[in-house]
Amino acid sequence: MSLTETLLEQPVVYRLWQAPFVAQKFAPVLAHNNMSRVNRVLDVACGPGTNSRQFEHTGYLGIDINESYIKSARKRYRRDFIAADARTYRVAPENRFDFILVNSFLHHIDTGDVVALLSNLRTLLTEDGCVHILDHVLPAPGSIARFLADADRGKFMRPLEDWKSIFSGLFHPIVLETYPLTGAGMRLWEMVYFKGSALK
């Protein structure tokens, strides 16, 4: 594990690194959804719990395999968090979620694990529920965004067409759009937002 990876495993360091981009990342979710209608949220790979602030008036459960992140999240946000593997997590039908968020995680795992994870998340959705995925798109070579992508901890950034193929194979697309993350007037990362319901 590199020094950067070791540092970002620390909840405080990770939270500070993400802080400038939290609002930008989440903006498409707010633009396309009436958050007052959300009932029960599952925040997959929730990290140190930053997303929980978006769901203060809903039922919320954050799940992450990193126990240090979960301990930090419980202490800081006083919401429900569990250390578990979302690929195998199960709930009773009455405890399913109408809003499942996967924010900036899938580019950390290979395609087999992405499919396994998303396949399981389908079983955790209510009949009217949707999955909401925010993730990095592999930028064109030679750009600042590509340099930052190559330096990222996640080694599985994918072109947009690959994301489309994965998502549409498991969910009915409702929204799929790309957007930039910017800083100092520059496009630093390219992102995709996908909203989908489970295929019947």
What residue ranges belong to the model's regions?
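A conserved beta-strand element that flanks and buttresses the S-adenosyl-L-methionine
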Residues: 101
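Hydrophobic adenine-recognition pocket in adenosine-nucleotide-binding enzymes
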Residues: 105
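Short acidic/histidine-rich motifs immediately flanking catalytic phosphotransfer sites
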Residues: 96
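Class I (Rossmann-like) S-adenosyl-L-methionine-dependent methyltransferase catalytic domain
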Residues: 1-91, 109-116, 120, 130-200
